[in-house]
Regions:
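Conserved aromatic beta-strand anchor motif in extracellular beta-sandwich/beta-rich domains
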Residues: 80-82
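The feature marks proteins involved in alpha-glucan
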Residues: 1-63, 67, 87-91, 96-145
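Short proline/glycine-enriched turn/loop motifs at strand-loop junctions of beta-rich domains
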Residues: 71-78
Length: 145
């Protein structure tokens, strides 16, 4: 049985697109799958696009400190390290929630003098392929040594 695909309106309006209609349909299907994935994982495209407001380093006025959050659903264990802890890989363990978000809280009382703008850091991730040092996905600035 042959799959019937509804013709995209743009192809109906522009006959010059008919030779590439199959490729356009594949791209459109891939787009729809990705949008469905985003809807399931983030709730909406807006929430997905605003991830930078939740992930990475975020100041918490109520708790008076910084949160570091990273989405790593397949990770078994995650640590954060950097110049603020003398690059000790396994000193600060992050905690995983049910959605696969790993987080660590840095109270200002303890880290005010060590954690500052321009601090260098990485995450140490234990996955199926072993331990790796990574640059966090939501890092806003990276430097190469």
């Amino acid at each position: 049985m042959e799959k019937t695909t509804r013709r995209l309106p743009i192809v109906e309006r522009d006959e010059w697109l008919q030779p590439v209609e199959a490729q356009m349909n594949l791209r459109h299907e891939r787009y729809e799958r990705k949008m469905a994935d985003i809807g399931r994982s983030a709730g909406s495209l807006v929430d997905y696009a605003n991830g930078y407001r939740y992930f990475g380093w975020q100041w918490d006025d109520v708790l008076d400190g910084w949160w570091l959050r990273e989405w790593l659903p397949g990770a078994h264990d995650v640590y954060v390290f950097g110049d603020f802890n003398n690059w000790q890989r396994t000193e600060i363990r992050m905690h995983k929630d049910a959605a696969g978000v790993w987080s660590a809280f840095f109270p200002a009382a303890m880290y005010r003098d060590r954690l500052r703008h321009g601090s260098l850091y990485k995450i140490h991730v234990h996955g199926d392929n072993g331990w790796l040092d990574r640059i966090p996905a939501y890092a806003r600035r990276v430097v190469q040594d």
